[in-house]
Design a protein with these regions (language model features):
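Hydrophobic core of transmembrane alpha-helices in multi-pass small-molecule transporters
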Residues: 115, 129-145, 346-366
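Central cavity-lining transmembrane alpha-helices of secondary-active solute carriers
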Residues: 76-94, 295-308
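Extracytoplasmic
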Residues: 36-67, 181, 273-278, 421
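Extracytoplasmic gate region of multi-pass secondary transporters
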Residues: 55-60, 253-302, 306, 366, ...
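C-terminal ends and interior cores of transmembrane alpha-helices
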Residues: 110-126, 326-345
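Glycine-rich segments within core transmembrane alpha-helices of 12-TM secondary carriers
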Residues: 144, 164-190, 407-421
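Conserved MFS/SLC helix-loop-helix module at the cytosolic interface between two early adjacent transmembrane helices
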Residues: 87-130
Length: 465
């Protein structure tokens, strides 16, 4: 009898034997365990994205509750969580092999309660300095780092041929936290939900009350619930354990840096647009109540990410990624035609429609590039181990470890887009009064990614899967 059967029934326990590439093992035991861990991971990651992007909904409302921050400062608050999130993704990407997926998921979800509670109190006190908001926004970045450890953890549970779909679901539905937050926050800030905990509203010109603290506090009970779910419901895989020394060599691979650049263009665009879209829309079309519509772009992008992984499993990640970058460049060019000039003209409907297309392609590309990473690093590692005369078991174990480390590190690079995009919009507006300068940079970058994808991966059919 396998040693894995008992732990599979006892959630939260360590599974000492895990062979997802064995069809019989996968059918009889593996699929059930992997699915349970995936469906606990998804809401934990979704909540993390809610917290990570809190300031995309809070910053635009700060002037309404009495704070006199400049537009550039507000853009900065939306951008900073991506800085800390990107930096923290590097160590987070190595945490699962060091501490275990169950323990780390529970810990990394639970600590997000801290910035949520603090932000709720801070927005109710107009004497709160800008420096305090900077600290809170940086703490929200811990939520963004969860993506690296979550994706690394799930990658250990699934066989190679199912990783694109599994990572697409985990990442895509997790990314949906951005749209969930941008949908829920405008609704709950109009309700007196937490009066018993000190929440009070600020009267608006139309006589309504704005309870901005609710945008942060609404996530606290859910974070507590899913922290417990992760602790008691997920499993540790003994085969996923690896020292830091075993994981670091992946940083020497040239493909790591190439794929980091491509992922920056896809996921970086998704998270950057998610962070900055509401503020950008407010500056270009001030009469539009953008928070009524802001959630839909991230929602489409999150769904597209799930689809991007599954489509890439069938058609090949390189092919999907290449076509996707062409579309991103086209839509970026179209965006110039939708903007007002000197505050005159422009079409919000066209602007919104083109941005939805950009969210869609950014989401698809996030899924397809992650599928490429998984395929590329598994093949590189297995070929290396076999060339050294290693066993199939060693090859599969090291391939899983290298792939998880690569996924985590590359996700850290991608998250930087969440800082650069809103900061680029803010700087362009401050210097020229228009976001056009930033948009030109994005367009050139997407065109460069088309060339890089084709030159490195697209010319050789053996790399297309």
């Amino acid at each position: 009898m396998s040693h894995s059967s008992a732990p599979e029934r006892a959630t939260g326990a360590v599974i000492t034997e895990w062979r997802p590439e064995d069809p019989a093992f996968w059918q009889q035991r593996g699929h059930r365990v992997a699915s349970r861990n995936l469906w606990i991971s998804v809401p934990c990651l979704l909540l993390a994205f809610c917290v990570w992007m809190l300031f995309s909904a809070v910053a635009v409302n700060l002037p309404k509750v009495g704070f006199n921050f400049t537009t550039d400062q507000l853009f900065m608050l939306t951008a900073l969580p991506s800085v800390s999130g990107a930096l923290l993704r590097v160590p987070y990407s190595f945490m699962v092999p060091l501490f275990g997926g169950c323990r780390w998921t529970a810990f990394s979800t639970g600590i997000l309660i801290v910035p949520c509670v603090w932000l709720g109190f801070a927005v109710q006190d107009t004497s709160t300095p800008f420096s305090t908001f900077i600290i809170i926004s940086l703490l929200c970045g811990f939520a963004g780092a969860n993506f690296a450890s979550s994706m690394a953890n799930i990658s250990f549970f699934f066989p190679k041929q199912k990783q694109g779909g599994a990572l697409g679901l985990n990442g895509g539905l997790g990314n949906m936290g951005v749209s969930v937050m941008q949908l829920v926050a405008p609704l709950v800030v109009s309700l007196s939900i937490f009066a018993a905990f000190g929440s009070h509203g600020v009267e608006q010109p139309d006589g309504s009350q704005l309870y901005l603290a609710n945008a942060a506090w609404i996530w606290v009970p859910f974070l507590a619930i899913f922290t417990l779910a992760a602790w008691f419901g997920m499993n540790e895989l003994a085969t996923s354990k690896a020292s830091l020394k075993e994981q670091l060599p992946v940083l020497k691979r040239g493909h790591l840096w190439i794929m980091s650049l491509l992922y920056l263009a896809t996921f970086g665009s998704f998270i950057g647009f998610s962070a900055g879209f509401a503020m950008l829309s407010k500056t270009q079309f001030p009469d539009v109540q953008i928070l009524h519509y802001a959630f839909f772009g991230p929602f489409i992008g999150a769904l597209a990410r799930s689809a991007g992984g599954a489509i890439s499993d069938r058609l090949g990640g390189t092919r999907v990624t290449l076509i996707n970058f062409v579309l991103m460049a086209i839509f970026s060019g179209l965006l110039f035609l939708t903007l007002p000039t000197g505050g005159v003209g422009g079409s919000f409907i066209a602007f919104y429609g083109v941005f939805l297309a950009l969210f869609l392609t950014a989401g698809l590309g996030s899924g397809s590039t992650f599928q490429m990473i998984s395929v590329i690093f598994r093949k590189l590692t297995m070929d290396r181990v076999k060339a050294e005369g290693g066993s199939d078991e060693r090859a599969m174990r090291e391939a899983a470890t290298d792939t998880a480390a690569a996924l985590g590190f590359i996700s850290a690079i991608g998250a930087i887009g969440g800082f650069f995009i809103p900061k680029a919009f803010g700087s362009s507006l401050a210097l020229t009064g228009s976001p056009v300068g930033a948009m030109k940079v994005f367009l050139i970058f997407y065109i460069a990614c088309v060339v890089i994808t084709w030159a490195v991966y697209g010319r050789h059919s053996k790399n297309k899967k």
